[in-house]
UniProtKB/Swiss-Prot annotation:
It comes from the Eukaryota. Transmembrane segments: none annotated. Disulfide bonds join 3-31, 5-20, 10-30. It is found in: Secreted. GO terms for cellular component: extracellular region. Anti-fungal and bactericidal activity, greater against Gram-positive bacteria. Belongs to the alpha-defensin family. This is Neutrophil defensin 3. The keyword Zinc-finger does not apply.
Length: 33
């Protein structure tokens, strides 16, 4: 499983499973199976 923190939505094959936080910015945690 590969995960990324993305600011603007997930790629088509990725799933949003949580959130990442850097300072005041919240990113989506997107994982690919």
């Amino acid at each position: 499983v590969t995960c990324f923190c993305r600011r603007r939505g997930c790629a088509s094959r990725e799933r949003l499973i949580g959130y990442c936080r850097f300072g005041n910015t919240i990113y989506g945690l997107c994982c690919r199976r």
